[in-house]
Amino acid sequence: MNPSIRLYAWQGTNADGLAVSGQMAGRSPAYVRAGLLRQGILVARLRPAGRAWRWPKRREKTDPAGFSRQLATLLKAGVPLLQAFEVMGRSGCDAAQAALLARLKQDVASGLGLADALQRHPGWFDTLYCNLVRVGEQSGTLDRQLEQLAGMLEQRLALHKKLRKAMIYPLLLLLTGLGVSAVLLLEVIPQFQSLFAGFDAALPAFTQWVIDLSTGLGRHAPVLLVSAVLLAVAARELYRKHRPARLWITQRVLGLPVFGKLLGQAALARFARSLATSYAAGVPLLDALGTVAKASGGELHQQAIQRLRQGMANGQGLNQAMAAEPLFPPLLVQLVAIGESSGTLDQMLEKAASHYEEQVSQALDQLTSLLEPAIVLVLGLLVGGLVVAMYLPIFQLGSLI
């Protein structure tokens, strides 16, 4: 194999005139264009793939979808695994990613399987990922398995990004409003207070209350700030290290009227898609449940999935075990029952995952459209109330003249 092989990203149109895009390995742009033309694809744009699998430093919160997609593309093109690592290392990755690829290449060259090599890097690849790669290695379908993994991870990442994006703007609005209110209370209102000190008349009750609040905050602001930081750190450590507290918090969050339902449906989508991918790859259902439980992302759901596994070990069908768990809604149970009876369990789970992802997407759009004006209204009332409180004595004084 020519060592000059590179990975190229392309955009073009297929025989039906539809816009398509993807990645392909080749020795040169002309080689890639010719290969795509043989597939009926007319290339409009072609460039070397770069930084396609960049991951942030907080690696544990991101899925290696880009890694899977690039590696699958190279393997499908006939590039040997060791050389594929070299090609990916030349595709614009940073120092940490280059070091990871070098270690993977070294481990595989020493005789380890890819799954075993990946398992040495749990901060990058979780148990579910490694197990599915192992299935692909054993069945001789590693490239196809990596493509399926990439699809699953891309869906999961897209849902996570949508959840995060929906919360960013309302959170920024809230923080901005609170910041403006803090400036008014700590900087502006004390100046009005010195102005009102020369008034002989008593201040309105609302104005006096705001001044007292400003005085109290100014006097105790450092203590309140330090206390808030310490409380946040303590709560975070309690959640991370104390299992009963983690379960209690998760139950309270899932019980919230709107956000709880959103997070619950997102967890169901993750469960259904992960289980569908594992089962479709040929992993036995009991083993697949054990792996999916570890990758479920939540203590409450992890316990529920382990109980499903226990129920199946005792002779129950998956749908029967799910029916006994309140975390799994009747629709999901019914789809699983249909899948088990018809031998299409992986397809029914994929349908369930798509359904819950669509539900989350629609609910997020509706929530965002309602939440943003509500926050603006509340913040307007808050800031406007502080301003009115300061001008009430002036209006009162003007009416007496």
Swiss-Prot record:
One of its GO terms (cellular component) is plasma membrane. It holds the Pfam family T2SSF. Keywords: Cell inner membrane, Cell membrane, Fimbrium biogenesis, Membrane, Protein transport, Transmembrane, Transmembrane helix, Transport. It comes from the Bacteria. GO terms for biological process: protein secretion by the type II secretion system. The chain crosses the membrane at residues 166-186, 215-235, 375-395. It is a multi-pass membrane protein. It is found in: Cell inner membrane. Its main location: membrane. Belongs to the GSP F family. Involved in the translocation of the type IV pilin (PilA). This is Type 4 fimbrial assembly protein PilC. It comes from Pseudomonas putida.
